[in-house]
Structures are given as structure tokens and as C-alpha cells.
């Protein structure tokens, strides 16, 4: 149970709560009523020798077919007075069920398959058996249970076993009145509509007006047809699976006497194919009529291009299955294939040609995204910033970066929760999902970890991959990082230090190297000398990285240099192990590029004691506290260095003024560094 915000409550002070398991518990209770003698069930479904009590509301909610049947019964006069009703192929009889409920008798479907479908309606779980899969798929299409249809399609995609299409027997009506003889030809089950011939087996193409009239009077018509659901404005071609029996017509006389598919066509509307010509005839007649069934699922197409696109979703072609030979596409005057689908001019296909990467096999919807993806394999960065020269793989990234130089990149998108600004709305949405929302819809199938965005989940999945060794250096890495690692071996270093000309594989390593080895200030100078900018020879200090036995450069003064400057770099926390050159000697070059001088010139905070410059005021305060305050005693006298306080001298003075000298002295007396200070009595001058 959780509380939700409801804007309809207003300021009246009402509360809204939502119980997420309420719907599950209701279906569970209804299922228990159905199994316990059919309590409160109002319909009895007879399948063969078995009977299944059920609730009309549940059946109508999960099946559009049952909704149409029950709606027709409510509108029928015979259903109102308790008499028998024949609604579009489903026989409803009074009595005989639990609580005097009506009965529906079903044919040509096994009780096991219908029991699985009925259990799915109450439990949302279904058992798919490969031996009865064609019958299950046919029944799901007829009942218009979209969830079961999607499950069947998913089974076809994931199963490595070739599943046979349903035979012609399964295509006949599943629900029909008792006593009605089986028809000798298959019906169209698409959208719950069935095209049936009369008792003599004669059927022809109907005009749209006749189709609408038949759909309106399907419930009261004398023909043995299924109810036509509202909203079906046309009866399509045979969309159900075709069996081998269709290849030979059971009515040769009718097939031979059928009129040919030739005639005058209107200027704007394509010709309408004859139904008998499409359903009956020899294999050659089917191809000439444009009937092209799919070899896996049995779906029928009238255009070879549509069939090829459909078979691409299965991963096979009709030629590989040996089901039917596809005719070559007809070409027009402009050289393009002509679509023979009656719906072609009115409804365009949404199927796009997908392209795959030759290196990694990733599939993209068009060539543009494929070419952009190939840049990740080549490492090419064709777009460079005209200001700083930084290169990018994509032009939009480069354009966005250029705006950062002139300050035009603002942050107009403000988070209403924390006030943080963002330059792009997608960045704001990602921030809200990640920080201010507890919902984590994307879950990992391995460790059950949940994430707010799909990108975070994709990055997390890399941790579950097994590490593989590099073929060059033998280093073990995950497959997601192996491509970037191999670039280091194939391309070599691409970022070189402008001072020592050392190469690095990435710009981040180069920045660490410059800060660590070349970002050290000069030795201390006297107050009377003019301050020297920290850039002439920034790395000439008392550090001994890279040289043997603590040796220094020959032009450095060993006397005036101070060891206290070894840790006073602007990046004092960045330390690297000792580096040696190839021949073991420490080389030094006094030539410093101009850009290095300009970057060091940005140090605009000079030390008033020694004249050294620093990039930030915090580095200057650290320098004064570590060097000048400790060396000269500072404003606190002998107590300043003894306290070892982490505060600045100004903060220490404020503490002394606030709490009094006696309190501070007694609090820090035990932490004095000099043991002689502990033994000396505090004189009056100390107070």
C-alpha cells in the first residue's frame, strides 16, 4: 500500500492510497470460485466431454471475441426470455450449468488447450506445449487474445525447433452451433471474421457495401459464420496459415470456372482480387494469383517484397525452407518493383531495412547511424574545435563544445527539487530519474539490481562479463573495454608532453603527468628579489624523481634549494613513483614552450613572504601555513606549531579570542610536540 498524490482532492485535506496487489488478489479469488464448483459463474463452456465454468466479465475482459458474443446475446430477444440463442456460431442454451448459467459449446479445439487459455485469463500464466502449439496459436488468433498472440510470436522467435503451421482443420470455425457440418475449406480467422462459402461451396468477392451489410447482420444471418466485431470495415485476404491441402483444390470445377484476375483497373484504386481464385487452384495458380504464404507462420502476402521483409524477421527465407518459390518482382518503367498488395497505395509498410556492422554485428535502422557507429571502431575524430583544437567524433558534440568557449552554454533547465541547473532537458530528466525518483524500472537479470535509466543498466552489465586476456600484452579485461585497450597497442601514444616529449595513450594521463612532474614551484627567493613566474623551469626543484641517488641538474643550486618545497606543488596530492629514462640518466631541458609560460602565468596569487605564485588562494594559504608559519613561529609563538591545529592562523586566533587562552591551553597541552615544552612551567608572559 502506498500513498499517491491526487490533484482532484484539492485543499480539502483528503488522502489517496493505492494497493498494488488488489487486482492480483481479485483474480485469485475469482479463480478459486471457478475451481470450487463454479460459484458465482454465469457461463458454462463445453469443450468435448469437459465443461469449464467461468465468469462472463473475465472472459469479455481478456478476449474481444467473447465480448462480441456476450454483447450480441444481450441485444438478442431470445436471450432476454431465457430461450436458446444462436449468436454467430456460438450456441447459447439455458440451464445445464452451475447456477442455471448459459452454455457455450465449442468444437475443433482440445480441452487441454482451452484449459490453458482459460487459466491464463485468471492467472496471467500459460504453459506453451510444442506439440499443441499450432492449435494454441490458432485459438488465440480466433479469440483475439492479444497477450497470448504475443507469447506465441515470442516462442517462434526464440525456439530453434521448426514449428509446423496449423493444418486446414484448425482453421475451421472453433465455435459453431451443434449439428452444423464441417466445411470443406479453410476460413479466414483474421480479426475474428470468417469468410465461408455456402453449402454448394460457391463464394465470390464482395463489394465494400455488401461487406458492411454482412457485418451488420452477421448475428441474425442464416449462414454459419462467426460474429464480425465492430470496427472491421473490410474482410482481408486469407491471413491464416496455409496448409499443403490448399495447394490442390478440393473443388476443381469451381477453380477452373472462376473468372481470371484480369480486367480494367480504375485510375486511383487497384483491382480487387477474387476470393475463390486466391483460396483454390494449383500451385502455379496461387503464384499467378499473387498468394505468397510464409513458410514459418503461414501468413499470406500478395507482394514478394512484403514477404521477404516479413521472413527477415524470422531469420530465414522461403527458398531456404523449400516452401514455395518466390516469383521475381515485377519492375516498372522506372526500374523499381511494383507492389501488388491491394492495400499498397493506401497503407505504406512501416518495415525499414536494417543494416548491421561488419565488425561487431550490431544492427541499426539506417545507414546514417551505422556510419556514425563505425567511428567508434576506427577511433577517427574528424571534427576539431577551431578554438582549442580538441577533436570529436560527432559534429553536434563539437558544436556544443565550441559554445562553451564564448560562454553561450547556459543552464536554463533548473531542477525544481534541488535547484541544480542543466544545459539540456535530457540531462535534467536523467538527473530527476537518478536522484529524486525512487523508481528503478530497469532491472539486471543476473543480480536483480535495478537502475533508473537504460544507460546505467547497460554500463552495469559489463561487470558480469567474463574477463578475457589481451592477445598482445596478456592483460585480462572485460570484452566491453577490450576494444579501447587494443587501440593502445595498434595506434600507440597520441598525447605527447610539450616539455619532455613523453607520450601517453589518453589526455587524462598527460594531465596527471604535467601536474606531477612539471607543476612544481621554484626554490625560495629573498624578499628583495623580483618575483619569478613559476614557469621558466617549473620542474627544477629539490625533487629527485627520475634521477639516480638524489642527483639534481647541473645548473641547479644545491645550497639555495630547500627540501621544504618538495610537497608544495599545486597538485601536491598527485604523486607518482620514480620514473627513469631508457638509459637510466635524468635528462633536463631548459627550453620551455610558450604555451607553458602562458599557462603558468595564470598563477595570480603571490606569496608576500617569498614571492611565489599560486593558482588558487587555498594553495597560497597552505603554502604560508606549511612554510612561513612553521619556520618563523607564526603569530602564536611557540604554541602555534605545537598545537598542530588543522585550522588556519586566523581561525586559531578566533578560537583563542572566543574561548580564552586558559581553556585552549589546557585542552591542547597534551598534544605538544616538543617534550621540553611539557616540562617547562608556563610563565606569566605566556598568559
UniProtKB/Swiss-Prot annotation:
Expression across tissues: Ubiquitous.
Biased composition (Basic and acidic residues): 549-558
BTB domain: residues covered: 41-130
Principal subcellular localisation of the protein: nucleus
Zinc finger (C2H2-type): 292-314, 355-377, 383-405, 413-436, 442-464, 495-518, 605-628
GO MF terms, alphabetically ordered: chromatin binding; DNA binding; DNA-binding transcription repressor activity, RNA polymerase II-specific; RNA polymerase II cis-regulatory region sequence-specific DNA binding; ubiquitin protein ligase binding; zinc ion binding
Record cross-link Glycyl lysine isopeptide (Lys-Gly) (interchain with G-Cter in SUMO2), residues: 112, 272
Subcellular location(s) of the protein: Nucleus
Disulfide bonds: none
Gene Ontology process terms (BP): male gonad development; negative regulation of DNA-templated transcription; negative regulation of endothelial cell migration; negative regulation of transcription by RNA polymerase II; positive regulation of DNA-templated transcription; regulation of cytokine production; regulation of DNA-templated transcription; regulation of immune system process
In-chain residues carrying the UniProt-annotated modification Phosphoserine: 282
Region (Disordered): 250-278, 332-351, 549-603
Regions of compositional bias (Low complexity) in chain numbering: 250-260
Signal peptide (UniProt feature, chain positions): none
Keyword DNA-binding in record: yes
Coiled coil: none
Function as written in the Swiss-Prot or TrEMBL entry: Transcriptional regulator that plays a role in many biological processes such as embryogenesis, senescence, T-cell development or neurogenesis. Interacts with the TP53 protein to control genes that are important in proliferation and in the DNA-damage response. Mechanistically, the interaction inhibits the DNA binding and transcriptional activity of TP53/p53. Part of the transcriptional network modulating regulatory T-cell development and controls the generation of the regulatory T-cell pool under homeostatic conditions.
Annotated disease: A chromosomal aberration involving PATZ1 is associated with small round cell sarcoma. Translocation t(1;22)(p36.1;q12) with EWSR1.
Family the UniProt entry places it in: Belongs to the krueppel C2H2-type zinc-finger protein family.
Record's subunit section: Homodimer. Interacts with RNF4. Interacts (via C-terminus) with TP53; this interaction inhibits TP53 ability to activate transcription.
Name of the protein this chain belongs to: POZ-, AT hook-, and zinc finger-containing protein 1
Amino acid at each position: 500500500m502506498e500513498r499517491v498524490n491526487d490533484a482532484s482532492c484539492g485543499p480539502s485535506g483528503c488522502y489517496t492510497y493505492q494497493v498494488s496487489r488488489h487486482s492480483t488478489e481479485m483474480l485469485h479469488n475469482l479463480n478459486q470460485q471457478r475451481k470450487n464448483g463454479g460459484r458465482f459463474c454465469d457461463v458454462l463452456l463445453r469443450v468435448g466431454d469437459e465443461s469449464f465454468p467461468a465468469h462472463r466479465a473475465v472472459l469479455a475482459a481478456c478476449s474481444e471475441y467473447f465480448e462480441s458474443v456476450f454483447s450480441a446475446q444481450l441485444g438478442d430477444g431470445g436471450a432476454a426470455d431465457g430461450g436458446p440463442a444462436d449468436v454467430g456460431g456460438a450456441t447459447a442454451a439455458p440451464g445445464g450449468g452451475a447456477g442455471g448459467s448459459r452454455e457455450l459449446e465449442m468444437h475443433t479445439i482440445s480441452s487441454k488447450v482451452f484449459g490453458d487459455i482459460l487459466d491464463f485469463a485468471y492467472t496471467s500464466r500459460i504453459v506453451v506445449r510444442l506439440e499443441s502449439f499450432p492449435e494454441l496459436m490458432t485459438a488465440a488468433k480466433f479469440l483475439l487474445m492479444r497477450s497470448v498472440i504475443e507469447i506465441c510470436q515470442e516462442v517462434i522467435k526464440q525456439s530453434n525447433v521448426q514449428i509446423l503451421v496449423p493444418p486446414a482443420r484448425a482453421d475451421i470455425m472453433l465455435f459453431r452451433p451443434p449439428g452444423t457440418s464441417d466445411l470443406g475449406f479453410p476460413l479466414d480467422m483474421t480479426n475474428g471474421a470468417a469468410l465461408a462459402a455456402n453449402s454448394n461451396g460457391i463464394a465470390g468477392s464482395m463489394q465494400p457495401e455488401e461487406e458492411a451489410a454482412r457485418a451488420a447482420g452477421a448475428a441474425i444471418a442464416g449462414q454459419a459464420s462467426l460474429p464480425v466485431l465492430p470496427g472491421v470495415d473490410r474482410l482481408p485476404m486469407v491471413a491464416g496459415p496455409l496448409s499443403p491441402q490448399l495447394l490442390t483444390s478440393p473443388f476443381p470445377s469451381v477453380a477452373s470456372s472462376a473468372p481470371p484476375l484480369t480486367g480494367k483497373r480504375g485510375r486511383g484504386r487497384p483491382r480487387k482480387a477474387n476470393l475463390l481464385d486466391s483460396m483454390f487452384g494449383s500451385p502455379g495458380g496461387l503464384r499467378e494469383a499473387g498468394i505468397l504464404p510464409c513458410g514459418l507462420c503461414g501468413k499470406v502476402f500478395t507482394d514478394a517484397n512484403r514477404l521477404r521483409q516479413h521472413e527477415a524477421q524470422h531469420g530465414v527465407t522461403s527458398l531456404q525452407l523449400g516452401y514455395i518459390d518466390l516469383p521475381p518482382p515485377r519492375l516498372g518503367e522506372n526500374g523499381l518493383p511494383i507492389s501488388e498488395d491491394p492495400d499498397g497505395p493506401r497503407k505504406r509498410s512501416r518495415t525499414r531495412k536494417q543494416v548491421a556492422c561488419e565488425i561487431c554485428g550490431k544492427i541499426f535502422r539506417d545507414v546514417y547511424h551505422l556510419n556514425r557507429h563505425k567511428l567508434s571502431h576506427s577511433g577517427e575524430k574528424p571534427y576539431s574545435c577551431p578554438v582549442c583544437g580538441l577533436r570529436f567524433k560527432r559534429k553536434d558534440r563539437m558544436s556544443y563544445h565550441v559554445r562553451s568557449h564564448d560562454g553561450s552554454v547556459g543552464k536554463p533547465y533548473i531542477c525544481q527539487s534541488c535547484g541544480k541547473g542543466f544545459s539540456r532537458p535530457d540531462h535534467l530528466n536523467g538527473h530527476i530519474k537518478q536522484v529524486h525518483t525512487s523508481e528503478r524500472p530497469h532491472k539486471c537479470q543476473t543480480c536483480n539490481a535495478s537502475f533508473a535509466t537504460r544507460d546505467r543498466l547497460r554500463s552495469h552489465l559489463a561487470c558480469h562479463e567474463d574477463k578475457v586476456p589481451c592477445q598482445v600484452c596478456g592483460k585480462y579485461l572485460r570484452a566491453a573495454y577490450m576494444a579501447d585497450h587494443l587501440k593502445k597497442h595498434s595506434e600507440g601514444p597520441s598525447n605527447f608532453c610539450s616539455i619532455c616529449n613523453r607520450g601517453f595513450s589518453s589526455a587524462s594521463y598527460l594531465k596527471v603527468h604535467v601536474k606531477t612532474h612539471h607543476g612544481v614551484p621554484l626554490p625560495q627567493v629573498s624578499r628583495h628579489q623580483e618575483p619569478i613566474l613559476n614557469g621558466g623551469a617549473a620542474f627544477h626543484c629539490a625533487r629527485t624523481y627520475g634521477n639516480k641517488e638524489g642527483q639534481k641538474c647541473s645548473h641547479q643550486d644545491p645550497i639555495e634549494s630547500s627540501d621544504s618545497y618538495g610537497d608544495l606543488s599545486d597538485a601536491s596530492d598527485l604523486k607518482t613513483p620514480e620514473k627513469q629514462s631508457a638509459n637510466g640518466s635524468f635528462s633536463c631541458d631548459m627550453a620551455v614552450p610558450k604555451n607553458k609560460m602562458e599557462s603558468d602565468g595564470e598563477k595570480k596569487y603571490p606569496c608576500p613572504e617569498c614571492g611565489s605564485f599560486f593558482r588558487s588562494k587555498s594553495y597560497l594559504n597552505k603554502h604560508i601555513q606549511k612554510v612561513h608559519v612553521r619556520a618563523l613561529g607564526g603569530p602564536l609563538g611557540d604554541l602555534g606549531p605545537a598545537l598542530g591545529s588543522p585550522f588556519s592562523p586566523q581561525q586559531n586566533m578566533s578560537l583563542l579570542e572566543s574561548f580564552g587562552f586558559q581553556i585552549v591551553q589546557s585542552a591542547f597541552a597534551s598534544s605538544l610536540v616538543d617534550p621540553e615544552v611539557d616540562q617547562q612551567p608556563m610563565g606569566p608572559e605566556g598568559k
